[in-house]
Amino acid sequence: MTPCLFLVLTLIPTLACLPDSPQNPQDGTLGSGAASAAAAAVDQQFIADILSRIARTGAEVGVAFRTLDGKMEWFSRADDVFHAASTMKIPVMIELFHQAREGKVKLDDPLIIKNEFHSLVDGSIYTLDGADDSEADLYKAIGQTRTLSQLCELMITVSSNFATNLLIEKLGVDNIRATVTSLHADGMNMRRGVEDNKAYEKGMNNTTTARGLLILLEAIAKGRAVDPDSSRQMVEILTRQKFNDAIPAGLPPGTRIAHKTGDITKIHHDAAIVYAPRPFVLVILVRGMAELKDSAALMADIARRIYQSAKQNTSSGPVATSKAIE
C-alpha cells in the first residue's frame, strides 16, 4: 500500500490521507490542540505543503518542530542521522556553562591561543587553517589569551572553528558527551573537534538528529540546560548569530530568534528557538543540496509555513498525532 499520512485528532475522529512523498517520515507526527475539523484541514495542508516543497528539491531533510507550550509539534525524519556540521557547537556552549556553574572554570578565565589539537584517531597533533575558517582574526592572536566567554561568542555567532576546538580541548569531549546524555538528547553524538581529517577519513564524525537538537534547544529555552540564568545567557548569545539567511529569512521582520547554523559540502542546517507570539523550537537539517542559497531558501519556506501554522492554531486542547503507515 502506498504510504499515507493520517491525522488522528483526539477530540474529533478525523482521518485524512495526504499525498505520498519521498520523505516518507515514518516517525512523522503533528500535534496540536485543534478541536475542530476546520483546524484539522489547516494542519493537513500545513503538512502537505511542507512535504511537497521538500520533495521538489530531492534532498534529505529532517524537521523537528514543537511549541514551547508543548501543544503543537511536527516531526519528519527527525531521527535520521546527519553530519552535525557546526550545530555541534551548541553542546560545547552548554558544557562551558555547566562547568562554570560547577566551579570548574570561570567564564572570564583566560585561555592561551595555540593552534594545536589532538586527533580522535591517534592523539596526533593537527592544526587549523584560517583560510578555511569563517573567522580569521583569532589566528592573529596565537600566543595571546582570550577569555572563555569571548571564545564562546566567536564559536556561536560567527562559527569560529578555532574557538570551538580551543573550548573542546579545555572542556573535554567526554564531559560534553556526558552533559548531552544528561539532557536526554540521544540523537546528538559529539565525538571530536573540527577539521580532524584523520577522523573524518575514518568516518568518525560528529552527528545529530533533528530531534536531538530540538531537545537541547528546548532545555535552553526552558531554563533547564544548566540553570535559568545560564540558559538566559546562552539564549542571548544565540540571538547574536550572524548567519541569518535560513530560518530567520522565513520569519516576519523583527522576530526574535536564537539559533545556530552549520554547513559543510551539501550539508546545511539551522536550529532555532523562535520567540513568536506562540514561541517554538524549529530544527531543519538538509543533506544533498549543492548550493547554500537553495537550502537556505528551503529552510526559510519551511519556517514561514510553520510560523503561520503556529500562529493560526491557538487552541489548547489535547495533542493529536499523525503517522505514515504502510
Protein language model annotation of sequence segments:
Residues I54-G58, F65, I94-K104, N115-F117, ...:
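Sec/Tat-exported extracytoplasmic proteins
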Residues C4-A16:
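Bacterial N-terminal signal peptides
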Residues H98-Q150:
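Active-site-proximal loop and beta-strand segments within enzyme catalytic domains
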Residues K71, H83-E116, M155, L282:
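Active-site SXXK
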Residues G33-A40, S76-H83, E135-I142, Q150-L154, ...:
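Second-shell loop/turn segments in exported
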Residues L51-S52, R56-F82, V105:
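Short, conserved catalytic-motif segment at the N-terminal edge
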Residues S21-A55, E73, K170-G172, I215-D245, ...:
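Structured C-terminal helix/loop/strand segments within mature extracytoplasmic catalytic/sensor domains
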Residues E60, G143-L148, C152, V158-L217:
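Mid-domain, small-residue-enriched loop/turn segments at the edges of structured enzyme/sensor domains
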